[in-house]
Amino acid sequence: MPGPLRSLEMESLQFRDVAVEFSLEEWHCLDTAQQNLYRDVMLENYRHLVFLGIIVSKPDLITCLEQGIKPLTMKRHEMIAKPPVVCSHFAQDLWPEQSIKDSYQKVILRKFEKCGHGNLHFKKGCESVDECKLHKRGYNGLNQCLTTTQSKIFQCGKYVKVFHQFSNSKRHKRRHTEKKPLKYIEGDKAFNQSSTHTTHKKIDTGEKPYKCEECGKAFNRSSHLTTHKITHTREKPYKCEECGKVFKYFSSFTTHKKIHSGEKPYICEECGKAFMYPYTLTTHKIIHTGEQPYKCKECDKAFNHPATLSSHKKIHTGEKPYTCDKCGKAFISSSILSKHEKIHTGEKPYKCEECGKAFTRSSHLTMHKIIHTGEKPYKCEECGKAFTWSAGLHKHRRTHTGEKPYKCEECGKAYTTSSNLTEHKTTHTGEKPYKCKECGKAFNWSSDLNKHKRIHIGQKPRT
């Protein structure tokens, strides 16, 4: 270790040094899937620091994310750490400690004490998580604070996190000298930094320059690409002690644990239904208002949730980036893949207290429970017909609109539901997947099989 470094005060790397914060405007530009992505990245970063023995106490942001609370509901300075960070943390060199434990580099920070004591707020001023974070308000004294322009890099063993100090020195200097940079105006939004402006423009233009070499999926931020790449790895370090299920993300693991505890603290004032998470309750409330603000430009179909719209769009593109390791079947979303994987494991963690029947999905259990209550909460505004499930109402509405969004590529015939299209396709392939257990006769359609079964029980088939 260099001689002068020994005389300087040392301090361990903290979570705030690897945390990413969005402004209120940037946060509102993200859909639910992207917000969940942010949550996973933050929880992964925290896990890495805990693994290295760098973090002892849990930051408020992590507690917030684990409980499903949106981070912007907290005060700015409370999100990353308590007490608020002082400017000296932005004027530091990073040096690897000489002793290496378990092949990981433990990082220590050199802190410059001359930099002042102002409490500062965070602002994400970079395009990627690989750049260091910047603060908003500065003060004079840069020459006392920054003693070198040399670029220092910190690398964390297996999980590589790189921070470039030099890349942000000019921005940091601007804040100390109080020189105002050129303001970029785009519609009704203003930006102090060209990089923030550039990132925002990518959202507006739809530009996605960061492409995954594995599956071809593109992103408008390199950090989103980095997080996406995890979906292609098979590593699942989080294991549930209750049922043995493993997870890639700590957030997914935390979510899963609530299945066993049965905790549902978020209750709908309208109908009394309880939920595990606040964002699930928010989504549920739209059922009562009937609002569907998210519209598909391809077919004009509307949705009450942005994530549902994102999944729907893949019907038009045919994109299926999530593949099952067991059977090779591909899916349009990771959540559908997770549900599919339960077919191979046979896991059915959701059990009905009324009759004991078990299900692979919580939504299936919820739908099943309505059988016992006889409740039909979903009512058609056109004709008044009521349905047990929202999916039933959604399909029924198409009888009024005449909409048939599912089209056969082979012959052009269109259908109101994807299941009808799937069954239709068997007429082209000659496949007859529905087989009678009594006599072995096979059918293209499940409805034809049901009609046939009546022959064996002595009923006349319906015409």
Curated annotation (Swiss-Prot):
- From the Swiss-Prot or TrEMBL record, state where the protein is found: Nucleus
GO molecular function of the protein, one example?
DNA-binding transcription factor activity, RNA polymerase II-specific
Cystines in this chain = none
Q: Where does the UniProt entry say this protein principally localizes?
A: nucleus
Q: Which GO terms describe its cellular component?
A: extracellular exosome; nucleus
Q: Which GO terms are recorded in the biological process aspect for this UniProt protein?
A: regulation of DNA-templated transcription
Instruction: State the superkingdom.
Output: Eukaryota
Q: Which InterPro entries match?
A: KRAB, KRAB_dom_sf, Znf_C2H2_sf, Znf_C2H2_type
- Zinc fingers (C2H2-type): give the ranges: 154-176, 210-232, 238-260, 266-288, 294-316, 322-344, 350-372, 378-400, 406-428, 434-456
- PROSITE patterns listed in its UniProt record: KRAB, ZINC_FINGER_C2H2_1, ZINC_FINGER_C2H2_2
Q: Gene3D superfamilies annotated for this entry?
A: 6.10.140.140, Classic Zinc Finger
Domain KRAB, residue spans: 13-84
Family to which the UniProt record says this protein belongs: Belongs to the krueppel C2H2-type zinc-finger protein family.
State the function annotated in the UniProt record.
May be involved in transcriptional regulation.
PANTHER family, per the entry: C2H2-TYPE DOMAIN-CONTAINING PROTEIN-RELATED, KRUEPPEL-LIKE TRANSCRIPTION FACTOR
The protein's name is Zinc finger protein 486
Q: Taxonomic lineage per UniProt?
A: Eukaryota, Metazoa, Chordata, Craniata, Vertebrata
